Amino acid sequence: MPIEILTIPCLNDNYAFLVHDTATGQTALIDVPEAAPILKVLAERTWQLSEVWITHHHADHVQGLGDILSAHPAQVRGAARDAHRLPALDVELRDGESFDFAGHKVDVMDVSGHTVGHIAYYCADAKAVFTADSLMALGCGRLFEGTADQMWDSLSKLAALPSETQVYSGHEYTAANARFALTIDPHNPDLISRSEGITAARAAAKPTVPSTLATEAATNPFLRAADPAIRAHLNMQHASDSEVFAEIRARKDAF
């Protein structure tokens, strides 16, 4: 494989990701919840970190950066609009821009909602999008700063990527998300089957990240605001998609 992606558990339920180009040896890190497990994998693989891509400013996604940079003097990328509350950036990124990583195009997507200024990184060559706390496995991030309309727009942008795209989200929340999803979409056979698989995976201490956009489109209630069965279940047949999404998000907040 020209691109290898490793999922690294951090803290209690965070994930960091290493993206390694096998042809050039270049390695990028997406988010830095803590340094120790990331440094361990880099040492085991004898990889030298060349870049760090930050998704948003929350401490559990950036707090290990200083220790990482002490061991690996990598270039740090992040959102220009969030630069005032991120660690020092070498490259400031804006929505719609792209950059080169080891000969692979990486697209920058503003996915505000969880925070304002949250970005995702999409690499078509890797068939991967790194969404952190925007689109999550069977869920989406809580709206700490943005509005429901903003998050719905962000999720809609992500959902428009190719269906085979692997979704690398920032937390292992999937089992709890599945329990909630079944209260919104209880008769969805794909969701029921996926929920059973998640239970088995977690019992075996296996990660449920990544998923695919096709899987999320079929099972994630936060992407399915237009679905007639969900609208009927919520008695919101005549509401807008963003209104249905907002109701689902409100119910999740209280779940």
Swiss-Prot record:
The prosthetic group or cofactor this protein requires is: Zn(2+)
Sorted alphabetically, the Gene Ontology BP terms of this entry are: methylglyoxal catabolic process to D-lactate via S-lactoyl-glutathione
What SMART domains has UniProt attached to this entry? Lactamase_B
- InterPro entries per the record? Clx_II_MBL, Glyoxalase_II_hydrolase, HAGH_C, Hydroxyacylglutathione_Hdrlase, Metallo-B-lactamas, RibonucZ/Hydroxyglut_hydro
Q: Which key words are in the record?
A: Hydrolase, Metal-binding, Zinc
**Where along this sequence does the record place binding of Zn(2+) 1?**
H56, H58, H114, D133
- GO MF: hydroxyacylglutathione hydrolase activity; metal ion binding
What are its E.C. numbers? 3.1.2.6
One Pfam family of this protein, by short name? HAGH_C
User: What does the entry's cofactor note say about binding and number?
Assistant: Binds 2 Zn(2+) ions per subunit.
Which reaction is this enzyme known to catalyze?
Answer: an S-(2-hydroxyacyl)glutathione + H2O = a 2-hydroxy carboxylate + glutathione + H(+)
Query: Its annotated pathway?
Result: Secondary metabolite metabolism; methylglyoxal degradation; (R)-lactate from methylglyoxal: step 2/2
Known Gene3D superfamilies for this protein? Ribonuclease Z/Hydroxyacylglutathione hydrolase-like (3.60.15.10)
Q: Where does Zn(2+) 2 bind?
A: D60, H61, D133, H171
Enzyme group, top EC level? hydrolase
Q: What is the recorded function of this protein according to its Swiss-Prot or TrEMBL entry?
A: Thiolesterase that catalyzes the hydrolysis of S-D-lactoyl-glutathione to form glutathione and D-lactic acid.
Oligomeric and partner information = Monomer.
Among NCBIfam families, the record links this protein to:
GSH_gloB
Q: Which family does it belong to?
A: Belongs to the metallo-beta-lactamase superfamily. Glyoxalase II family.
Name this polypeptide is given: Hydroxyacylglutathione hydrolase
